[in-house]
UniProtKB/Swiss-Prot annotation:
GO CC terms, sorted: centriolar satellite; cytoplasm; cytosol; FNIP-folliculin RagC/D GAP; lysosomal membrane
Reported modifications of this chain: Phosphorylated by AMPK.
Gene designation per UniProt: FNIP2
InterPro entries: DENN_FNIP1/2, FNIP_C_dom, FNIP_fam, FNIP_mid_dom, FNIP_N_dom
Keywords for this protein: Cytoplasm, DNA damage, Lysosome, Membrane, Phosphoprotein
BP GO annotations: intrinsic apoptotic signaling pathway in response to DNA damage; negative regulation of transcription by RNA polymerase II; positive regulation of protein-containing complex assembly; positive regulation of TORC1 signaling
Keyword Nucleotidyltransferase attributed: no
Tissue specificity statement from the Swiss-Prot or TrEMBL entry: Widely expressed with highest levels in muscle, nasal mucosa, salivary gland, uvula, fat, liver, heart, placenta and pancreas. Moderately expressed in the lung, small intestine, kidney and brain. Lower levels detected in renal cell carcinoma than in normal kidney tissue. Higher levels detected in oncocytoma tumors than in normal kidney. Higher levels detected in renal cell carcinoma tumors than in normal kidney tissue.
Chain positions covered by the region annotation Disordered: 12-32, 93-126, 203-237, 585-632, 645-665, 747-800, 875-900
Protein's UniProt name: Folliculin-interacting protein 2
Length: 1114
């Protein structure tokens, strides 16, 4: 017998290469090759579905395994015809000729896609063989150790290394009716193929992957909030709900009608942070998709059977053997996970319906045939959707995102966009088609609204700064939320009230015209640009890398010499950790980044890192010196005056210090259990290591002057070995101790220095505090290239003269601010001693190369991403964007938000507070982290570049924007897709309405289809759009300006001003409607001058800042 179609489907080694060749022929050419995934690495037929049941009486049983399904060819029915086999047209996703038994595989792409209706009334014949040998092990992985009594769902992701597979599984508690309260009749139908005495147990002999593979869990099933429970249920199941990865990111908001959900972009992010933070307690998630229904809703439930069953659904993706291909698919999978979960829920609904329906069939063989065919159909639809999402051609350079990413060719980009924009206005707006399309897009894709909010700046500055938002950037650091979630919500326009999810499809046979429309719309479909931070754990560092000495702490049990008890011995080993380079290192540093001649510590002393501590902690008692600060990155809030820790404190100790420059040491803070190296020994070691040739410039250091402008360093983590209190809980006591020590340092000193400081306007701006000016040992800031000639003028240090020291501080500040003025009073001794100090600092034994904690000053402009860390003194160069010292995560430099008035005030207050009292600044020195590398490259690993697609061969449901040549599949699938979007929203928050904008360039019509309104006319997909006069006048004015040959950036600024005008009109409308319950449209026209055709647009805009407007007018 010739190999069956299903055998070819699942025979990976035999068919993967040829199926890749077949798939290559069926694909449309990419619009930007670098902006999609390689389809040859992904075979959609290698997606496997397993349905498992766990019953407290009958144990675990496999209800379905797609690997065990084989198609029985109906030779008699199709002997003379060479037509494609149709597994309900949904499973195949393509065509394969039956007559040639050697035909390699089904082609990857069918013209009708994955949702066409049944081509044949009669069910295809399937043979369900014995499930594969690995199902027992996979069942163990799916169910895990969750108790049967636990209600709610759990979701897990496993990566199986051999063969490489990615498994996503979701376990539901079964909900059953009384008369049909089991799947026994379905299971009995399977008994002749599924009987296995070992089912329900992990049979390692049958386990093709070996017993050890069960431990390959990625541990992604993070416990989150418990579902709300009824009164009759027990409350002590002892497990947190673990429903979905995206439920960690996405939780419910207040109801759309409440005023607290006035969903501005900023407020949505703040709410997301509140609802996902464990500090705020557990907020129940919505209960849909939590249970698996095994009976129709009309069945009455039987309480005795409530806890008896769990159903697990698992999707397994077989990965390519190549590592790069595996990495590509994993990138795709995890960056698009909310979409995967949404489609998995849709698959679950289809399985529920199949199970319920098949019970009504009396004959066992027909029941199995019906059940298997329905599941294969649903699996085929899932495969097709994932394939489409993976292989769709993307728009290479979306206009708004490319403008935001700080491209150097911004002017050319503006010119190209304006050229395309005005061409469309001239060509396709004669019958108001383009104006209608833009009206619909601005009405439903509302993420543009926060970008045009006024930002108290002159227009030209407002335009250049619109890319970024300080307040959102600060929010992302202080109240973390998932930026992918924020980006997805912005793209779908889900920031109004009530919440709508919107997609736009442009239909037309003229491919060039459709592509041009899609390109122009990417300016109005706005979202955040994401900056990705990646950790590189590699110990091998490149030639130009700066290295920090990290520490590896090893604990071991050793028996005591006298007592019989055992002691925990902590060993600290220094290991290098890479740090992203701030500025190019000098030649000396590049060839010898670390001193190699530091002598070994004598036996008996603990070899610890010599960390630098801020002066605030300099007087700490030795017992408190065990804080782990091995290679601290100085927080910008820390004072820049330094003392040797526990070695030279106070004037009387200065007398004991050696009289050369070596007395100014970095603090000898010890990392470990409290032992200290002898201070004199440290001095001796450091004197041995005085460099013969001083480097040209010292290592990078934060500019003191810039501290006045940057945000406070908010997230510092200090590990204290042997300390039970968290750093936060110890904060107040440490503050008190510090204040006492400040007072003890000498009031007269404070007074004299304050007088000196007041005499010099430069010094008065200094963040340094009187009382910390003693024993200054501060390396000079690395300045920009032009300042190298003056780099030796810095902190002169003279024990006898306080005035000179204050003047030196002023001089240093003037350099750091690039003022170009000469240093005030930095004498020759100062320069000489500074050299000695710098030499000590650079060559300190195992001393860390200090790197400033990322300043995070947001230099908002065309070349920089918000939240970028700008190296000090290097403003004119291109900066390396990265985040150090934080837990690496994507940071949202939110395009969809300009500073609104109150936010601008808030950030101004933060900046004011920064230049004021610095006593509450950061006390901790950060531990070295592995290299955190920020990636600002344009890729499709975020929704902004992935869901804005080009001209596709068929309609695709997930995409925010795409074009297609035919609306045939659109008509078939649109209604079901809109309903699915409402029931299984990818944002996982309650959605009031799902909307699809359909622009047909063949019929010159723009319609809006919605999940709420049924269309009575069969010829139409939705309601026609009412063209806004505001949008029409905007298009005409842009066209006139362009024809007058005004500069492109001026035209775009005018466009932004007109959009802002719409926003301000919506504010006016909301203010007028405040307190009203009903208002007549004519009244609005008379009082506010708002035309009736502008009302839908202005109402939608107003819903982003005033939710009550929609309730009054809709």
């Amino acid at each position: 017998m010739a190999p069956t179609l299903l055998q070819k489907l699942f025979n990976k080694r035999g068919s993967s290469g040829s199926s890749a060749a077949a798939s290559a022929q069926g694909r449309a050419p990419k619009e930007g090759p670098a902006f999609s995934w390689s389809c040859s690495e992904f075979d959609l037929n290698e997606i496997r579905l397993i349905v498992y049941q766990d019953c407290d009486r009958r144990g675990r049983q496999v209800l379905f395994d797609s690997k065990a399904v084989q198609k029985i060819e109906e030779v008699t029915a199709q002997k003379t015809e060479d037509v494609p086999i149709k597994i309900s047209a949904k499973c195949c996703q393509g065509s394969s000729s039956v007559s040639s038994s050697s035909s390699s595989s089904i082609s990857s792409h069918s013209s009708s896609g994955g949702s066409s209706h049944h081509a044949k009334e009669q069910l295809p014949k399937y043979q369900y063989t014995r499930p594969a040998s690995d199902v027992n092990m996979l069942g163990e992985m799916m169910f895990g150790s969750v108790a049967m009594s636990y209600k709610g769902s759990t979701l897990k992701i496993h990566y199986i290394r051999s063969p490489p597979q990615l498994m996503i599984s979701k376990v539901f508690s079964a909900r059953m009716g009384s008369f049909c309260g089991s799947t026994n009749n379905l299971q009995d139908s399977f008994e002749y193929i599924n009987q296995d005495p070992n089912l329900g147990k992990l049979n390692t002999n049958q386990n093709s992957l070996g017993p050890c593979r069960t431990g390959s869990n990625l541990a992604h099933s993070t416990p989150v909030d418990m579902p709300s429970r009824g009164q009759n249920e027990d409350r002590d199941s002892g497990i947190a709900r673990s429903a979905s990865l995206s439920s960690l990111l996405i939780t419910p908001f207040p109801s759309p009608s409440s005023s607290t959900s006035s969903s501005s972009s900023y407020q949505r992010r703040w709410l997301r942070s509140q609802t996902t933070s464990l500090e705020n307690g557990i907020i129940p998630r919505r209960s849909t998709d939590e249970t698996f229904s095994l009976a129709e809703e009309t069945c009455s439930s039987n309480p005795a059977m409530v806890r008896r069953k769990k159903i697990a659904i698992s999707i397994i993706f077989s990965l390519c053997e190549k590592e790069e291909a595996q990495r590509n698919f994993q990138d795709f999978f995890f960056s698009h996970f909310p979409l995967f979960e949404s489609h998995m829920n849709r698959l679950k609904s289809a399985i529920e319906k199949a199970m319920i329906s098949c019970r009504k069939i009396a004959e066992s063989s027909l029941r199995v045939q019906f059940y298997v065919s329905r599941l294969m159909e649903a699996l085929g639809e899932f495969r097709g959707t994932i394939w489409n999402l993976y292989s769709v051609p993307r728009i290479a350079e979306p206009v708004w995102l490319t403008m935001m990413s700080g491209t150097l060719e911004k002017n050319q980009l503006c010119q190209r966009f304006l050229k395309e924009f005005t061409l469309l206005i001239e060509q396709i707006n004669k019958n108001q088609f383009f104006a209608a399309l833009l009206t619909a897009v601005l009405t439903y894709h509302l993420a543009w609204v926060p970008t045009v909010m006024p930002v108290d700046h002159p227009p030209i500055k407002a335009f250049s700064e619109k890319r970024t938002s300080q307040s959102v950037n600060m929010l992302a650091k202080t109240h973390p939320y998932n930026p992918l979630w924020a980006q997805l919500g912005d793209l779908y326009g889900a920031i109004g009230s009530p919440v709508r999810l919107t997609r736009t499809v442009v239909v037309g046979k003229q491919k060039d015209l459709v592509q041009r429309i899609l390109y122009v719309l990417t300016y109005f479909l706005r979202c955040s640009e994401l900056q990705e931070n990646q950790l590189t754990w590699s110990g091998n560092h490149g030639e130009g890398d700066q290295v920090l000495n990290g520490s590896k702490i090893i604990t071991a049990l050793e028996k005591g010499e006298v007592e019989e008890s055992e002691y925990v011995v902590i060993t600290v080993r220094n290991e290098p950790a890479l740090v992203p380079p701030i500025l190019p290192p000098t030649a000396a540093e590049r060839h010898n980044p670390w001193p190699t001649g530091f002598p070994e510590c004598p036996e008996g002393t603990d070899s610890r890192d010599l960390g630098l501590k801020p002066d605030k902690e300099a007087n700490r008692r030795p017992e408190q010196g065990s804080e782990a600060c091995s290679a601290g990155c100085l927080g910008p809030a820390s004072d820049a005056s330094w003392k040797p820790q526990n070695a030279f404190c106070g004037d009387e100790k200065n007398k004991e210090a050696p009289q050369d420059g070596s007395s100014r040491l970095p603090s000898c803070e010890v990392l470990g259990a409290g032992m200290k190296m002898d201070q004199q020994a440290v001095c001796e070691l450091l004197k041995v290591e005085m460099p013969t040739r001083l480097p040209d410039r010292s290592v990078a250091w934060p500019c003191p002057d810039r501290h006045l402008r940057e945000k406070p360093s908010l997230e510092k983590v200090t590990f204290q070995i042997g300390s039970f209190a968290s750093p936060e809980s110890d904060f107040e006591s440490r503050m008190k101790k510090m204040e006492e020590r400040v007072k003890a340092c000498g009031p007269s000193l404070e007074a004299s220095e304050a007088a000196d400081v007041a005499q010099d306007p430069q010094v008065s701006r200094s963040p340094f505090k009187p009382g910390f000016q003693e024993n200054v040992c501060c390396p000079q800031n690395r300045l920009s290239e032009g300042d190298e000639g003056e780099s030796d003028k810095g902190f002169a240090e003279d024990r006898g003269s306080r005035n000179d020291m204050a003047a030196d501080i002023a001089g240093q500040l003037s350099h750091a601010a690039d003022l170009g003025t000469a240093s005030h009073g930095a004498g020759g001794t100062g320069g000489r001693r500074l050299e000695a100090t710098r030499g000590l600092y650079v060559k300190a034994a195992e001393g860390p190369v200090l790197e400033p904690v990322a300043p995070r000053c947001v230099q908002r402009g065309p070349g920089l991403v918000a939240g970028a860390n700008i190296p000090c003194g290097d403003d004119n160069k291109k900066a390396n964007f990265r985040t150090e010292g934080d837990i690496p995560r994507n940071e949202s430099s939110d395009s969809a938000l300009g500073d609104s008035d109150d936010e601008a005030c808030a950030s101004a207050m933060l900046d004011l507070g920064h230049g004021g009292d610095r006593t509450g600044g950061s006390l901790e020195v950060e531990l070295p982290l592995p290299r955190s590398q920020s990636i600002s490259t344009q890729n499709v690993r975020n929704f902004g570049r992935s869901l804005l697609a080009g001209y596709c061969p068929t309609y695709m449901p997930d995409l925010v924007l795409h074009g297609t040549g035919s609306d045939e599949k659109l008509k078939q699938c649109l209604v079901a897709d809109l309903v699915h979007t409402v029931h299984h929203p990818v944002l996982d928050e309650p959605i009031a309405e799902a909307v699809c904008i359909i622009a047909d360039t063949d019929k010159w019509s723009v319609q809006v289809a919605t999940s709420q309104r049924k269309v009575t006319d069969n010829m139409k997909l939705g309601q026609d759009v009412l063209v806004s006069s505001q949008v029409s006048s905007l298009l005409q004015s842009i066209l006139q300006l362009y024809k007058l040959h005004l500069p492109a950036d001026f035209c775009i600024m005018h466009l932004e001003d007109r959009l802002q005008e719409m926003y301000l009109k919506s504010k006016m409308l909301s203010e007028y409607l405040r307190g009203h319950t009903r208002v007549h449209v004519k009244e609005l026209g008379v009082v506010l001058g708002i035309e009736s055709n502008d009302l839908p647009l202005l109402t939608a805009i107003a819903s982003t800042h005033s939710p009550y407007v929609a309730q009054i007018l809709l």
